[in-house]
């Protein structure tokens, strides 16, 4: 590795083989020392889960050009933990990136997302961290049109850093041209019609998690979902500390 170049750790929740992570590596490999450690298979929806009772394995995969690639049988967070402990050596990454995720992580999906789990884990290790996602759900889509925007965000975070305990959730509309960038808050919403019930031929019920994410404030123009719906790149600063400070005094008044 060239210590004069930034060192970037990349993971995701779609798996080391996914088009999105390969695209992200291709954007950055000529400008930084990049290391990939990602799940061996898709781990969408794993958020910040880690493996407390399952032994983990690291497996070396084929390089992406000159970029070293490892997979792990665990979660996205497991990948970050193992990479920092076992693969990075004595060099701490300058940046942790998650993505590029096939599917947006706006609104409450922020909480479920394994891609955001990558960024949160990096953030909790005091490393500037960013999660990238696109509303384009096509696993084989050509995402090269994201290059300039991704690189500009990465360069700015490398130059200026991020506040302690803050990571970025970046979501792109499905297709260009983009209207610009909106720095915005997370949309409040909820998943509805989530459970699909079916009957197995062997005589028992089984269930699929499905449904749709409902936007509960569709007219609020300061939200990530509004930005995406109107063609803007949505950047949401996300805090690790989820304390509701405004409500602390109210709870104290309960005399519990």
Where are these regions (language model features)?
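Glycine-rich phosphate/pyrophosphate-binding loops
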Residues: 123-145
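Short, glycine-rich nucleotide/cofactor-binding loops
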Residues: 10-17, 109-110
């Amino acid at each position: 590795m060239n210590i004069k170049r930034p060192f970037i750790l990349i993971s995701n929740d779609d798996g080391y083989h996914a088009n999105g992570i390969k695209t992200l590596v291709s954007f950055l490999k000529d400008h930084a020392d990049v290391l990939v450690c990602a799940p061996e298979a898709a781990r969408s929806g794993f958020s910040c889960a880690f493996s407390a009772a399952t032994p983990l394995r690291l497996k070396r995969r084929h390089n992406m050009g000159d970029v070293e690639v490892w997979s792990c049988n665990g979660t996205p967070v497991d990948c970050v933990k193992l990479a920092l402990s076992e693969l990075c050596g004595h060099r701490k990454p300058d940046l942790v990136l998650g993505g590029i995720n096939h599917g947006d992580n706006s609104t409450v999906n922020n909480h479920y997302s394994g891609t955001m789990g990558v960024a949160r884990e990096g953030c909790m290790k005091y490393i500037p961290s960013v999660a990238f996602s696109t509303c384009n759900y096509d696993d084989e889509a050509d995402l090269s049109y994201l290059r300039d925007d991704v690189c500009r965000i990465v360069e700015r975070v490398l130059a200026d850093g991020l506040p302690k305990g803050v990571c970025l959730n970046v979501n792109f509309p499905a297709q260009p041209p983009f209207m610009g960038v909106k720095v915005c808050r997370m949309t409040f919403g909820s998943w509805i019609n989530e459970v699909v019930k079916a009957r197995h031929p062997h005589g028992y019920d089984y269930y699929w998690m499905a449904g749709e994410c409902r936007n509960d404030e569709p007219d609020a123009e300061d939200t990530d979902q509004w930005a995406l719906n109107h063609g803007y790149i949505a950047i949401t600063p996300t805090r690790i500390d989820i304390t509701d400070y405004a409500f602390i005094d109210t709870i104290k008044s309960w005399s519990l």
